[in-house]
A protein has these predicted regions:
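Bacterial N-terminal signal peptides that target proteins for export
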Residues: 1-13
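Bacterial N-terminal signal peptides
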Residues: 11-23
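Flavin (FAD/FMN)-binding glycine-rich loop and adjacent Rossmann-like elements that form
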Residues: 32-33, 155-156, 160-236, 240-679
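Beta1/beta-strand and adjacent pyrophosphate-binding region of the FAD-binding site
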Residues: 34-48
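Second-shell loop/turn segments in exported
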Residues: 43, 88-93, 119-128, 233, ...
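N-terminal Rossmann-fold NAD(P) dinucleotide-binding loop
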Residues: 51
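Conserved N-terminal/central alpha/beta ligand/cofactor-binding core
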Residues: 63-64, 68-176, 184-188, 192
Length: 679
């Protein structure tokens, strides 16, 4: 009913950029023939949690899986990005409603340490060393290959450079990725080992074919594994990168940054949208508590970033509180302490903390001068969309500044006495800590920063058009949010017609009364659940959590503020679903998108980004790819309307559920309209 209301009574703003056709992409000729050709049934690009989940399920299904990753660790946000503190919601965690692979990860962490929370942190029930996360996940993939009789081809330090996209004569409505060229780098003899230099100093080299002073390069061509007979698709490429590289390189329709305000995205901070304002990214680091005070050297660049740093809120203005928030190792429990209503154990020598703090090492650019993820227009102007010209799609200078910003934050923690948000007299130095660096440090880098920044937002595809979604499928703010949409903000900032449409969409069966004018928005009762999708293949639950971009350039400018209105949409969300339609891009039939690049809005993406969601979406992608190969169909055929009549879709969902990969939360039904007890 809600979908029909959308279709009949509204259209999305005309500011959306849509590409209706895709020009065939021919591989540019590398400087030499590929050094090796590798056959895959599933090419999973990106070794984060979504990619790991996809590979895990593909291997258990007996498939040949090629997994590429720009760093040399699997796990993404819980390993190479350093955020080794599982973001979970209480009810889902208590009932353990997670995909089987994620549950196995939690169990292996517990077995490895003898407890689930070796860091005794208070942000999560599980904080641990990032490198251990990588080791555990790598072991899980190897075991999955043995158990499912699949084949794992693991390609660390590898990036996709080019794609060949053509029409497949065996079927489908669009084109397909026929092959991919990748570059793998390894240290030259006599050169510094991997992870010596921060990402900003090596990323452009990683996307360059030629050997360099640091790296030898291996050119790899990925191709489909041959089948006995013609298939609708010979293989599947799964987009699981942290920024949506493949959707940019393949040039399928996508969005970036803030979406225009509409009745579907009523809390948007912009009426027209802004592709440059994405959520902040973070280079994490680890610091260890010492028994004696340490001497800390002032970074040359500290004065540039010092005006930014803050505890943010008075109730959080305590060093021990911030330190223990994401403490990842605590061999000896300290005394109990309470500050701002929060209780924790004080740090003791040998404790290790991972830092990830909004007004600390978050770097939050938001203008065309410094945005991290290049827009399509910027990529086109730079020539990165031309064959063989792809360089990763990120602004190297912004990566560099994010690295400096993070190192400066450590110095502020141990030596600083300023606070940009709370003023003088709040921050005092605490020199009993060292910055951990070295290949044997928790981050596994000589420089001490995470191998890759923690990314909260990426390019997000626009799903396929249909009768109900004429502008392309998208999960929007109102599909998951618990906000009170009768708040004065919405009455003031939405037109009367838009305000009425908003409440009609939230009203379920009563929506037509509102649209006809038979009832006012205030007279109807809004639904108290997220939107239910008949093609749901996964689940997630987290708050709509914002780390907004800053208003002015540069982000660290003294007196700079967060983008006005960006936090309006934040708050609690209902448990939500991962529909198959959110994973299928336009134009390309054998590309499945997972992780942070699925078709969700800017505000919804603030919830669709945590560890268990990434795994669930990855498990859905890997299972869908394996199912499509076995059933000799294309994934979009599973959701051709009417979806409710798709027997193959139901078979896919039944396979996921039978494999303990939930497609719904318990008691999900249009008749269960109250999820207020879920926290």
């Amino acid at each position: 009913m809600l979908n029909r209301i959308r279709r009949c009574f509204s259209t999305l703003p005309l500011t959306l950029v849509m590409w209706q056709v895709i020009t065939p992409l021919t591989l540019a000729t590398p400087p030499r023939n590929p050094d090796k050709t590798v056959e895959c049934e599933l090419l999973v690009v990106g070794g984060g949690l979504a990619g790991t989940g996809a590979a895990y399920e593909g291997l258990l299904a007996g498939k040949t899986v090629c997994l590429t990753e720009i760093t040399d660790w699997v796990g993404g946000q819980l390993s190479s990005q350093g955020t080794s503190a599982l973001d979970e919601r209480p009810t889902q965690r208590t009932q353990l409603i997670y995909p089987r692979g994620y549950l196995e990860l939690r169990e292996r962490l517990k077995d490895y340490y003898g407890e689930l929370n070796p860091g005794d942190c208070w942000v999560s029930e599980s904080c641990f060393i990032p490198e251990d996360g990588h080791k555990i996940l790598k072991g899980m993939l190897e075991d999955a290959a043995r158990k499912g009789r699949g084949q794992l081809n693991w390609f660390p330090s590898t990036v996709i450079k080019d794609l060949s996209i053509e029409k497949n004569p065996n079927g489908g409505t669009g084109k397909q990725i026929m092959s991919a060229i990748a570059i793998q780098h390894s240290p030259k003899d006599g050169a510094a080992p991997l992870n010596t230099y921060p990402l900003s100093q090596t990323i452009e080299d990683a996307y360059t074919y030629e050997d360099s002073e640091l790296f030898n390069k291996t050119i790899i061509k990925f191709v489909p594994k041959p089948h006995d007979k013609a298939e609708p698709a010979d293989w599947y490429v799964i987009e699981a990168t942290e920024t949506g590289e493949i959707i940019a390189l393949a040039d399928v329709p996508y969005r970036l940054g803030i979406d225009p305000r509409s009745y579907l995205e009523p809390s948007s901070s912009s009426t027209s949208g802004d592709p440059y304002c994405t959520q902040g990214f973070t280079y994490t680091f680890a610091m260890e508590t010492t028994a004696e005070p340490q001497q800390h050297q002032l970074p040359d660049f500290y004065a540039q970033y010092a005006p930014y740093y803050s505890y943010e809120l008075e109730r959080l203005a305590d060093f021990d509180l911030v330190y223990t928030y994401r403490r990842i190792w605590s061999p000896q429990k300290g005394e109990q302490k309470t500050f701002g209503g929060l209780s924790f154990t004080v740090p003791t020598p040998g404790d290790i903390s991972m830092q990830n703090w909004t007004w600390g090492n978050d770097y939050r650019p938001g203008t065309a001068k410094d945005n991290l993820i290049y827009t399509r227009e910027q990529l086109e102007q730079m020539g990165q969309l031309e064959p063989g010209k792809w360089m990763g799609g990120l602004r190297t200078e912004t990566l560099r500044k994010g690295e400096e910003h993070s190192i400066g934050y450590f110095y502020w923690l141990v030596s600083g006495d300023t606070d940009s948000q709370l003023g003088d007299g709040v921050k005092t130095p605490d020199p009993y800590h060292v910055y951990m660096k070295g290949l044997d440090s928790p981050m596994g880098t000589v420089h001490g920063l995470s191998k890759y920044p923690y990314m909260r937002e990426a390019r997000r595809i626009i799903g396929r058009e249909s009768f109900l979604y004429e502008n392309g499928f998208m999960v929007n703010e109102i599909d998951i949010s618990r906000r009170n949409y009768q708040d004065d903000f919405y009455k003031t900032n939405l037109s009367p017609a838009t305000y009425r449409r908003l409440h009609a969409a939230l009203a379920g069966l009563e929506g037509f009364k509102v649209l006809r004018g038979d009832a006012s928005p205030e007279q109807i009762t809004r639904r108290k659940r997220s939107t239910i999708y008949p093609d749901s293949l996964g689940i997630g639950h987290y708050a709509i959590d914002f780390h907004p971009c800053m208003t002015e350039y540069p982000a660290e400018k003294p007196g700079n503020t967060e983008r006005k209105g960006e936090r309006v949409g934040q708050g609690q969300a209902y448990p939500f679903q991962v529909p198959l339609r959110s994973m299928l891009p336009q134009n390309i039939d054998n590309l499945i998108v997972t992780g942070k690049s699925i078709a969700v809005s800017h505000i919804a993406a603030a919830a669709y980004r945590v560890h268990s969601f990434e795994w669930s979406s990855g498990a859905a992608a890997g299972t869908t790819a394996a199912f499509a190969i076995e059933e000799q169909l294309l994934p979009y055929q599973l959701v051709e309307e009417p979806i409710f009549r798709s027997k193959k879709l139901q078979e896919l969902r039944q396979r996921l559920d039978a494999n303990d990969n939930p497609t719904n939360f318990p008691n999900t039904s249009i008749f269960n309209d109250n999820w207020d007890d879920w926290r």
